[in-house]
């Protein structure tokens, strides 16, 4: 289990590295998907399954809108790949900042805490995941509807902008 958590943490950091170097929006979205899958997998392995699923669905919806908008604005005929020297320099700088942060923050001291799952306290522990489910269905349903409507509206606006000036409501005057 420890190796699996370490693997998910490494995938999360590598996804952040892929987004931070961001040679092109085509490759940046791969880093976003990798980071979101690793983060939600980490929550899932800790026992927070419903919140992990909701975060994954909302985050993928947001990433879809950002990806469509970025690709529409950056139509490069020759996009940079991750093997270019500038992108490798960004990656080395990101890893350097990460190493300095671990040295200053005391990386070795973090191993003393360990990983605690949701149900590790005992039989009568309250799972925060199912408490969150009750809040989603009672008080949070209106907010989820507003957030879903906003994502759908943003997607249609971006698709209208991508379509061009020839047809649609947005025209050159």
From Swiss-Prot:
Catalytic reaction annotation: a ubiquinone + NADH + 5 H(+)(in) = a ubiquinol + NAD(+) + 4 H(+)(out)
An MF annotation (GO) of this entry: NADH dehydrogenase (ubiquinone) activity
Record keyword Cell wall biogenesis/degradation present: no
GO cellular component, one term: mitochondrial membrane
Membrane topology: Multi-pass membrane protein
Protein keywords: Electron transport, Membrane, Mitochondrion, NAD, Respiratory chain, Translocase, Transmembrane, Transmembrane helix, Transport, Ubiquinone
Entry's EC annotation: 7.1.1.2
Subcellular compartments: Mitochondrion membrane
Entry-linked Pfam families: Oxidored_q3
Membrane-spanning residues: 1-21, 27-47, 48-68, 87-107, 139-159
Family: Belongs to the complex I subunit 6 family.
Entry function: Core subunit of the mitochondrial membrane respiratory chain NADH dehydrogenase (Complex I) that is believed to belong to the minimal assembly required for catalysis. Complex I functions in the transfer of electrons from NADH to the respiratory chain. The immediate electron acceptor for the enzyme is believed to be ubiquinone.
PANTHER family for the chain: NADH UBIQUINONE OXIDOREDUCTASE SUBUNIT ND6, NADH-UBIQUINONE OXIDOREDUCTASE CHAIN 6
Protein name per Swiss-Prot or TrEMBL: NADH-ubiquinone oxidoreductase chain 6
Source species of the chain: Alca torda
Lineage of origin: Eukaryota, Metazoa, Chordata, Craniata, Vertebrata
């Amino acid at each position: 289990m420890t190796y699996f958590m370490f693997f998910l943490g490494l995938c999360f950091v590598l996804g952040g590295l892929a987004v931070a170097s961001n040679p092109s929006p085509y490759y940046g979205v791969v880093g976003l998907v990798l980071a979101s899958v690793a983060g939600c997998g980490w929550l899932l392995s800790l026992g927070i399954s419903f919140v992990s699923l909701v975060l994954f669905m909302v985050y993928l919806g947001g990433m879809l809108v950002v990806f469509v908008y970025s690709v529409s604005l950056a139509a490069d005929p020759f996009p940079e790949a991750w093997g270019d020297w500038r992108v490798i320099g960004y990656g080395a700088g990101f890893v350097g900042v990460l190493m300095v942060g671990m040295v200053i923050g005391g990386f070795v001291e973090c191993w003393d805490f360990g990983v605690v799952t949701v149900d590790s306290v005992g039989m009568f522990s309250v799972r925060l995941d199912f408490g969150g489910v009750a809040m989603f269905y009672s008080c949070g349903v209106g907010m989820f509807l507003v957030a879903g409507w906003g994502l759908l509206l943003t997607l249609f606006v971006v698709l209208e902008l991508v379509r061009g000036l020839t047809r649609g409501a947005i025209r050159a005057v």
